């Protein structure tokens, strides 16, 4: 029983598997058939769509072909019509040329006829002229016989009489025209100068050769002098400026003709007073610091001046030299202010005459630039200024304005003439300059230059208003014996070459320093 059940179950399973396989196969075959049918439908549909697209493209191609054909035919028709028009114009031109040719032929015939007539008339004129010349000669001979003069003598006499009659009239006319021209030129020049001067409002204060440093109290005077005068001697030696400490309450006077040195000394002394530490080593540091500060001030003054007159693209070194003019005076007149004033005047005159205002300003600012270093370099301030302008690539017009503003060379441009006129205007106005101060400063500069010309001299300072020249020498080159000889030589040369009131004390300073650093 159990075996039969197992067999039946096994048979049922086998039949179930076989039946399932048959059913699954039938389903698979049915799906494959459906898939083939679907694929065939898709292919058929694709063929139909392809046929439709092909037909559409063929239609579009035919339409485009038709459009191109129509356009080509239209262009051909247009070209044919254009060719016909050109052919018509050419035919018309040919006809015109033929007509003109006929006209020219006719004119040639007429001209030939006229030329023949002119030749006939010319022959008649020549015959008449010959007869006239014969008559004239007869008349001249008759006149010479009657007057007793030849033809040339008669002509010369007549010309001389006419010349005498006209010479006086011509002289009067020329004189009147010259007078009118001079009056017109003078009037125009006065109007130009008056206009320029009225447009410029410049103030001026005469430069001084002293500076005053205020002190917090009179005890500070003793600290400035130092033990046995060491501090004041160090400061005077380093700066070349006299320190005058007198009864003036809470003030020290700095005296010196070189404004740059005086400003360095003033700045150093102000810093020392503020710091409170005053001894030779500190003085040296402060003097060096003051030199740098004054250099910055000089550079800023140059930049401000160039900006004020619109002188752009100037070399930085030349700008700094322009700034040095702020510490230079000419007959008591500040040279930088004078240069700016000349620049403005030259610009105004140039504007009235239609010249380049910017170039006139630049030339006016630089016309006295040589004065900034004329006490350091040999030569006149004009020669030095020309060399500086060439060195720093200035315009030829600017160089000529510098060279010609004192008449050393001929001006080559209107700008140069205007700068010279502006320079004269600035210098000649009342109160602008003082002759005495300039002569005094030149005497001190000459005193220093003379002393520095000797070998072994490092620096020379004119102090005590020119009554003393202090000469700093190199201890390696000048010994104690040579220092006495040097003082005597300088004294002799001063007596031979300079004119001065009173006496001048010559002091030769020879200092040897031994410095070591403890580590």
Swiss-Prot record:
Enzyme class: hydrolase
PANTHER family reported for this sequence: RIBONUCLEASE Y
Annotated compartments: Cell membrane
Flavoprotein in keyword set: no
Name used for this protein in its record: Ribonuclease Y
Alphabetical list of PROSITE patterns matching this protein: HD (PS51831), KH_TYPE_1 (PS50084)
Molecular function via GO: RNA binding; RNA endonuclease activity
Species, as recorded: Staphylococcus aureus (strain NCTC 8325 / PS 47)
Phenotypic effect of disruption: No visible phenotype.
pH dependence statement: Optimum pH is 9.0.
Domain KH: 209-269
Quaternary state and interactors: Homodimer. Component of a possible RNA degradosome complex composed of cshA, eno, pfkA, pnp, rnjA, rnjB, rnpA and rny. Interacts specifically with RNA helicase CshA and enolase.
């Amino acid at each position: 029983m159990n075996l039969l059940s197992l067999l039946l179950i096994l048979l049922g399973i086998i039949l179930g598997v076989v039946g399932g396989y048959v059913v699954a196969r039938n389903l698979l075959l049915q799906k494959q058939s459906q898939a083939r049918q679907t694929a065939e439908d898709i292919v058929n549909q694709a063929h139909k769509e392809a046929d439709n697209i092909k037909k559409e493209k063929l239609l579009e191609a035919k339409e485009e072909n038709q459009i191109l054909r129509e356009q080509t035919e239209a262009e051909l028709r247009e070209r044919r019509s254009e060719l016909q028009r050109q052919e018509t114009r050419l035919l018309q031109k040919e006809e015109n040329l033929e007509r003109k040719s006929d006209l020219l032929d006719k004119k040639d015939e007429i001209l030939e006829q006229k030329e023949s007539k002119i030749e006939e008339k010319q022959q008649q004129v020549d015959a008449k002229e010959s007869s006239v010349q014969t008559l004239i000669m007869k008349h001249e001979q008759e006149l010479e016989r009657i007057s007793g003069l030849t033809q040339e003598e008669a002509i010369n006499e007549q010309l001389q009489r006419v010349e005498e009659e006209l010479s006086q009239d011509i002289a009067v006319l020329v004189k009147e025209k010259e007078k009118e021209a001079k009056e017109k030129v003078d009037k125009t020049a006065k109007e130009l100068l008056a206009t320029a001067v009225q447009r410029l409002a410049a103030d001026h204060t005469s430069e001084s050769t002293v500076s005053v440093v205020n002190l917090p109290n009179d005890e500070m005077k003793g600290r400035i002098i130092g033990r046995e005068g060491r501090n004041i001697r160090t400061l005077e030696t380093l700066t070349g400026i006299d320190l005058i400490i007198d009864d003036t309450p809470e003030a020290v006077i700095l005296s010196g003709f070189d404004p740059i040195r005086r400003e360095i000394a003033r700045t150093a002394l102000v810093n020392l007073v503020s710091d409170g530490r005053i001894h030779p080593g500190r003085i040296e540091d402060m003097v060096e610091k003051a030199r740098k500060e004054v250099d910055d001030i000089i550079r800023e003054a140059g930049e401000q001046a160039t900006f004020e007159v619109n002188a752009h693209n100037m070399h930085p070194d030349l700008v700094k030299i322009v700034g040095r003019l702020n510490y230079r005076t000419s007959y008591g007149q500040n040279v930088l202010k004078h240069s700016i004033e000349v620049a403005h005047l030259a610009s105004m005159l140039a504007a009235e005459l239609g010249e380049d205002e910017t170039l006139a300003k630049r030339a006016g600012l630089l016309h006295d630039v040589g004065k900034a270093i004329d006490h350091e370099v040999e030569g006149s301030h004009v020669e030095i200024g020309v060399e500086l302008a060439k060195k720093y690539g200035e315009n030829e017009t600017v160089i000529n304005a510098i060279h010609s503003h004192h008449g050393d060379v001929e001006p080559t441009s209107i700008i140069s003439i205007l700068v010279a006129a502006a320079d004269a205007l600035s210098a000649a106005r009342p109160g602008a300059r003082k002759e005495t101060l300039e002569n005094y400063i030149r005497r001190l500069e000459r005193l220093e230059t003379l002393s520095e010309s000797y070998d072994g001299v490092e620096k020379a300072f004119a102090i005590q208003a020119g009554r003393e020249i202090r000469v700093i020498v190199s201890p390696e080159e000048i010994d104690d014996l040579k220092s006495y000889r040097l003082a005597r030589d300088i004294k002799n040369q001063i007596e031979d070459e300079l004119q001065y009131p009173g006496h001048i004390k010559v002091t030769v300073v020879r200092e040897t320093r031994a410095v070591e650093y403890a580590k």
